[in-house]
A protein has these predicted regions:
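Catalytic Walker B motif of ABC-type/P-loop ATPase nucleotide-binding domains
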Residues: 141-145
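The feature captures the beta-strand-to-loop junction immediately N-terminal to the Walker
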Residues: 30-32
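Conserved ABC ATPase "signature" region
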Residues: 85, 89, 95-112
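Conserved ABC transporter NBD signature motif
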Residues: 46, 53-65
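C-terminal coupling/interaction segments
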Residues: 244-278
Length: 278
């Protein structure tokens, strides 16, 4: 999308927003409620028309872009198989049983489950919605808050699916979420939107690093470290939270390894106020 603007009466929901996503790339969109994320996604999917600007997708396919906006919109009284058949026909596809089975397998859903989707977990509903979004083989996928309502296992499983779609099918994927830690794991680039304007855009590492105020380091023997005593550190169980900048964290991790501290994870703690500073 290029130079996209959209107003609702006196409210400017989007103000000259430009965003791009390449084949095989995952772009994360970060913003508070009311920042313009859903409006942007609706414009990209053709649900809304922008007041100014345009959406360009380099694709000759029948459906160049697919997506989920907010909660999955499914026929709750139908099973997964039947949902795919209905949505396939709506999109003008000739649906065979083999095609439906392949679509379900692609997103990791069982092909033999016959009960209505109202019985499905939120994670399974998200997967089914993605299968529907992928009908007609679009080259771009837009996911608005796909982790909402999922437990940690469901989030991890969905992350794996998203990265697989980007890597193996070379889909361009644009995803929004309030869970910054998950975007940090899977996104190549991050874009920060505030009051309808893009205020930051860059590699995930750069955007996260600029707003990081501490790191939480996990290791079974972390409390035995002498190096950590030189830093502003809080140790609880097998985790140490260290107030340190991203420019110094690599050196600290090196020193911990020299002490034979077996690190299992190192997670940045982001100051959200800093992230949303213009």
């Amino acid at each position: 999308g290029y130079n996209l603007s959209k107003s609702y009466k006196s409210l400017k929901a989007l103000d000259n927003v430009s965003i791009n996503c390449k084949k095989g790339e995952i772009i994360g969109l970060v913003g508070a409620n009311g920042s313009g994320k859903s409006t942007l996604f609706k414009i990209l999917l053709g649900v809304l028309k922008p007041d100014t600007g345009n959406v360009t997708i380099n694709s000759k396919k029948t459906k160049p872009i697919g997506g989920i906006i907010e909660k999955p919109a499914l026929y709750e009284y139908l099973n997964a198989f039947e949902n795919l058949k209905v949505f396939g026909r709506i999109q003008g596809l000739k649906i065979t049983n083999d095609f439906v089975e392949e679509s379900l397998k692609k997103v990791g859903l069982p092909v033999d489950r016959k009960d209505p989707v109202k019985n499905f977990s939120m994670g399974m509903k998200q997967r089914l919605s993605i299968a529907i979004a992928l009908l007609n083989n679009p080259e771009c996928l837009v996911l608005d808050e796909p982790f909402s309502g999922l437990d940690p296992m469901g989030i991890s499983s969905l992350n794996t699916l998203i990265t697989t779609l980007a890597e193996e099918q070379e889909l361009a994927i644009l995803i929004s979420s309030h869970i910054l830690g998950e975007l940090n794991k899977i996104c190549d680039r991050l874009t920060v939107i505030k009051n309808g304007k893009i205020i930051k855009s860059g590699t995930t590492r750069d955007i996260i690093s600029q707003s990081t105020v501490a790191y939480t380091i996990a290791a079974l023997d972390i409390s035995s470290s002498l190096v950590l005593k030189k830093y502003d550190t809080t140790i609880k169980n097998n985790q140490a939270t260290v107030k340190i900048s991203y420019t110094d964290i690599s050196e600290l991790l090196y020193k911990l390894r020299e002490e034979n501290i077996h690190i299992t994870s190192c997670v940045p703690e982001v100051d959200m106020n800093k992230l949303f500073e213009n």
